[in-house]
Amino acid sequence: MEQTWRWYGPNDPVSLADVRQAGATGVVTALHHIPNGEVWSVEEILKRKAIVEDAGLVWSVVESVPIHEDIKTHTGNYEQWIANYQQTLRNLVQCGIRTVCYNFMPVLDWTRTDLEYVLPDGSKALRFDQIEFAAFEMHILKRPGAEADYTEEEIAQAAERFATMSDEDKARLTRNIIAGLPGAEEGYTLDQFRKHLELYKDIDKAKLRENFAVFLKAIIPVAEEVGVRMAVHPDDPPRPILGLPRIVSTIEDMQWMVDTVNSMANGFTMCTGSYGVRADNDLVDMIKQFGPRIYFTHLRSTMREDNPKTFHEAAHLNGDVDMYEVVKAIVEEEHRRKAEGKEDLIPMRPDHGHQMLDDLKKKTNPGYSAIGRLKGLAEVRGVELAIQRAFFSR
């Protein structure tokens, strides 16, 4: 695997010098300063590429070229936003960048309720608490009909939890959910958030798939023409939330994408932490079935709790993800490609490290502190080395 590292640009507290010292050779980044939907110019792409290369690294993957909300709702100026997206892909290829991670999650990208969940060893992790989320949705957001998405027990527990929250607790929970986590391209006030949810009131899973198909049928032929590998990131969490449909959550969703546009440019980001939240997702089977279309991997693990919809970010080699079997399946796919004469490695980045050691005293991007990811990268690197030596060194 190609060892990469997500970097949020010049304002990231983790420097490119840090990235290189961690042992990564590739950088995963994006032009976050360009508004959603606008074309990434060759000039702006080359500026970022030069910064990365001056640090002795390469820009391996774009994460992400965000998709404008008008495309997801099939409203407004969606045709122009699609044309802009097509041009951005052409410009990236002109600059030598050919792997693009993206997602089709409506309104919110990845979602957590607690950004400082303290683990038994004193380090901090990200957590999604189903009951806290229900308390937010029913008692703070007050989304009409939200009760239908929860069990009677969850509704009662959410009411109890809300009753014990201070004003600061409520503000923090709201901020964590709607203000935008690292990599998210949108942040909202509560009123703005309600208005954006309203835009989806008539969009169910079938309609969102229909809108996604319009995007794929416009974008994938351009990607195929210019040589871009599109790698969709799964929903996080991989299930409907806030009354919004989610359509990249299961192996069935992956198959739907392939059936909709059967091009090798139409590929996947294997995010083990996102897919792995669902106990019914067999990660190794996903890799084996769709291996030739996996162009990027996010390796992390999560741990489901007593309520199976509550989870926290586990250490990379712990939790519900069998990281050994996952890495073995990825390495096997790389060797299959090599046997076909393809030498390209699959870019991998350690995802969502714990905040630990000296980083506990620093301001960090939630999930993206340096030391926790350094630990994760070293652990995954060791797993891969052992697999390569044991099975492929002859």
Curated annotation (Swiss-Prot):
It catalyses: D-mannonate = 2-dehydro-3-deoxy-D-gluconate + H2O. Pathway: Carbohydrate metabolism; pentose and glucuronate interconversion. It comes from the Bacteria. It is an enzyme of class 4 (lyase). One of its GO terms (molecular function) is mannonate dehydratase activity. GO terms for biological process: D-glucuronate catabolic process. Its EC number is 4.2.1.8. SUPFAM superfamilies: Xylose isomerase-like. Keywords: Iron, Lyase, Manganese. Belongs to the mannonate dehydratase family. Catalyzes the dehydration of D-mannonate. NCBIfam families: PRK03906.1, uxuA. This is Mannonate dehydratase. It comes from Shigella sonnei (strain Ss046). The gene is uxuA.
